């Protein structure tokens, strides 16, 4: 919020302390990156022909357009660590505030320089090419109006331990201190997690024409029976999630208006399901729905893509696609969504 810049030269990215803790070609150690449950990159491993590690914290920003996708990078936690076994020192770096703007980058020596390093890069102002008119092929570069109303902060945790498991314990301790609800839970308190799928799209032929309609997988009555059977089996702590229960199913229409799926049963059947879960001790029922995306834009459903859909910087609608893993292009067999 306090960054100033010339409007003719907007700040697109910010790289904070890129070489803090960097090691040279003579030192031994490794970096921890948020790949899966924690990936390990050894210093000076000689793999100079491979690309540097780069991953978006929490995944791609869908407000940015893309025409192809080769690799979907996604980090589920905003952490990187550097452990120097030569100096017997290490630190963890956690992106706290503004982590959703961050990208994790790490690389070894022997490529652009002689250092092994890891850093966070923050995308501040997004820009895209916009066509000036349909009568010419001239494009201009447009940017967002200003910086996001956000504060960027990074927390460093220093240690003299360099073992992978010790660094994992350091991060666990940090999380338990920041989020007390993540404390130890006894085995007798562990809940059984159950997800039930209500309705999905299926193609039916009516008078010879293919029509996409909702197909019932787990009706309201069947969902209640499943929970009853689990309760009778002696499972007293259940967290149940019911997905695809309204607005045509899993690939639903806008949640601005809620309508039950006729093929799953009546509204009273759904009320019986929720009432049973409410009166049963140790049972939690979560009616799951999608509120960030609209898979089907129908008339009078409370949503208009031209009016309500998110827009790219180029002022075009944010249309999202399913990607073909072979061609890396948008898969035309599936409809786009917003």
Segments (PLM) and residue ranges:
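Carbohydrate-recognition beta-sandwich/jelly-roll modules
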Residues: 1-217, 224-233, 237-238
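Aromatic-lined carbohydrate-binding/catalytic grooves of carbohydrate-active enzymes
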Residues: 187-275, 280-283, 287-337
